[in-house]
From Swiss-Prot:
GO cellular component: plasma membrane
Keywords: ATP-binding, Cell membrane, Membrane, Nucleotide-binding, Phosphate transport, Translocase, Transport
Family: Belongs to the ABC transporter superfamily. Phosphate importer (TC 3.A.1.7) family.
Compartment annotation: Cell membrane
Domain ABC transporter as annotated: residue spans: 33-281
Protein name (database record): Phosphate import ATP-binding protein PstB
Chain residue ranges for the region called Disordered: 1-27
Basic and acidic residues: compositionally biased ranges: 15-27
């Protein structure tokens, strides 16, 4: 195993430094979501096996691991988005503020409002303006005054680090924006619903370095008010922005994905407990 200092130098963190409000050595942030012994199936195929995890409030949790190990499947279980796939089902328990999100009386639409999702590929509504893209989800609820909608649009675009770039062209199509701007527009659209948790499935994988930096900066700002869970293949990104990291792994092709190791990001990247974790974060496979 490499010396600890070498691993730390390889993965300098940005999200946990004193300048950004460091995480305490003993984190006392409350749990906002708890996953207990989660198994997930698509038909008869077991995609995830026995995953347990605590997701803490106002923290960024990164999910890493090789392709096909269940990261995106897992993140979709956190707001029941996987249920749009025929034959998908879960065993185990997932709670949000102590409430089982899979309880029979729980409306999955309500879960998805409380746990928002930003997908890998930006997906602004092509027939809508930038303004209308932001408030699209609000149109399904109570009627709001124009002044209230204006405030929501400005606030969420500021939170997504996009306001200054679009404030003079809110009536233009959302698809007129660059890829990075479109992704930040999708973040603003998610924020307009005032979720407690924001899920991001490789939100910067298709973006250039400048756009990626803006997404990361936005994430670090967002965790002051929200809890963020991000799937990423970018080890530098996970090390820079996250407080906690979960490493997913499959032992062999056709086997279910498992949460191989979970803990504070500093430890996962500098002194992991399992050899497979070290091999992955140091680039020996994956």
């Amino acid at each position: 195993m490499e010396p600890k200092e070498t691993l730390r130098q390889r993965w300098p963190g940005r999200g946990r430094t004193e300048e950004t409000g460091a995480m305490k050595k003993s984190d006392d942030a409350p749990a906002v979501m708890t996953v207990e012994h989660l198994n997930m199936y698509y038909g008869s195929f077991m995609a995830l096996k026995d995953v347990s995890m605590v997701i803490r409030k106002n923290r960024i949790t990164a999910l890493i691991g090789p392709s096909g190990c269940g990261k995106s499947t897992f993140i979709r279980s956190l707001n029941r988005m996987h249920e749009i796939v025929p034959g998908a089902r879960v065993e185990g328990r997932v709670t949000l503020d102590g409430e089982d999100i899979y309880a029979p009386e729980v409306d999955p639409v309500r879960v998805r409002r409380r746990v928002g999702m930003v997908f890998q590929k930006p997906n602004p509504f092509p027939t809508m303006s930038i303004y209308d893209n932001v408030i699209a989800g609000l149109k399904l609820g109570r009627k709001r005054k124009k002044s209230e909608l204006d405030e929501i649009v400005e606030r969420t675009l500021r939170q997504a680090a996009l306001w200054d770039e679009v404030k003079n062209k809110l009536s233009e199509s959302g698809t007129s924006l660059s890829g990075g701007q479109q992704q930040r527009l999708c973040i603003a659209r998610t924020l307009a619903l005032e979720p407690e948790v924001i899920l991001m499935d490789e939100p910067a994988s298709a973006l250039d370095p400048v756009s990626t930096q803006k997404i990361e900066d936005a994430m670090l700002e967002l965790k002051e008010q929200y809890t963020v869970v991000i799937v990423t293949h970018n080890m530098q990104q996970a090390a820079r922005v996250s407080d906690y990291t979960g490493f997913f792994f499959i032992e062999d092709m056709g086997q279910p994905g498992q949460l191989w190791e979970f803990g504070e990001t500093e430890k996962i990247f500098s002194n992991p407990d399992r050899k497979e974790t070290e091999d992955y974060v140091t680039g020996r496979f994956g």
